[in-house]
Amino acid sequence: MKRVNAILRHPLFAEKLRLLDTLEAERAFCRHDLTHLLDVARLMWIDVLERGLEIDRDVVYAAALLHDLGRAEQMQSGIPHEDAGAMLAERILPDAGFSAEETDAVIAAIRCHRGSAPADAREMLGEILYRADKASRTCWRCGARGACNWPEERKNAGIAR
């Protein structure tokens, strides 16, 4: 997990996560803090193991850690967070020791994690990220559930596969 720790220690990652924590400090809805990012990473890794997929653990964690990092940029300038996150990943991942191929895979996953799960098998990492991101939310115990703009059918009623 040397490369994952390099992401966590990267100055740009730390700066954007601190900014996001500040911007979301009063947010009533789901936050995009380190706890969320690690929840997504762990759910992704469980999915990879259960399905017997051959995806490097560092790549899984990189996608999870970076997938919402662009939210601060979205809140400040309106740039979609998946686009801002992809740009941040382009800067952080090479510094953390990820290859060009790994970086491209993580960027593709970040770019597609907001829409519907991709059907293309080449986008497996994006599909896993999409599912884990949605599954990570504890809607059933959220105090702001009634005010949330997610449709009821998208809100998690409990822990599910």
Predicted segments with their positions:
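Metal-dependent phosphohydrolase cores
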Residues: 1-161
